């Protein structure tokens, strides 16, 4: 009994190893099935719309016919076709001329290059920090103006100095005017001297009185 038990254990381990070896093969097969074969739906739609020569656009029914003619399974991938049309319209590669949503007619946009250029332009909010840098030179440019105003202020200071010199120049005129009354005073002094002379002439008038006294003495 002890000899037969170890022989049964390896027999059970062998089928388990075979099952583990088969599982990776199934996983590899699943990975191969998931890989997309051929171009995407959006590429097929753009090719079909660009190939059409209709001015009003390619209808959904005509688009499905073109895709089926190219070997695409339209019945299985009907939902993918509609999603692809909506995404192309939202991106701007296709323009919907009729209908709404995925139904209607579609054509290529006239200027697809401009639409692609506009999308990256919207992604430039990083240029906003440059505005404060542009304001700094403006403030720096304002400072020299203030300095220029400070330089102009000495001119204003010079004007009061010039006014002071003018006032100083005018002051001698006032001094000369004040000196003129002194000349008048000196001119008046001879008049006073002239007035003194008649006072000295009064003793001459006393002589007649002495003559009268002599006449009175002679009469006696």
Swiss-Prot record:
It is found in: Nucleus; Chromosome. Residues 37-110 form the H15 domain. GO terms for biological process: chromosome condensation; negative regulation of DNA recombination; nucleosome assembly. Residues 1-19, 27-39 have a biased composition (Low complexity). GO terms for cellular component: nucleosome; nucleus. Residues 1-40, 85-220 are annotated as: Disordered. The modification N-acetylserine is found at residue 2. Residues 119-134, 142-159, 167-185, 194-220 have a biased composition (Basic residues). GO terms for molecular function: double-stranded DNA binding; nucleosomal DNA binding; structural constituent of chromatin. SMART domains: H15. It comes from the Eukaryota. Keywords: Acetylation, Chromosome, DNA-binding, Nucleus. Belongs to the histone H1/H5 family. Histones H1 are necessary for the condensation of nucleosome chains into higher-order structures. This is Histone H1.10. It comes from Gallus gallus.
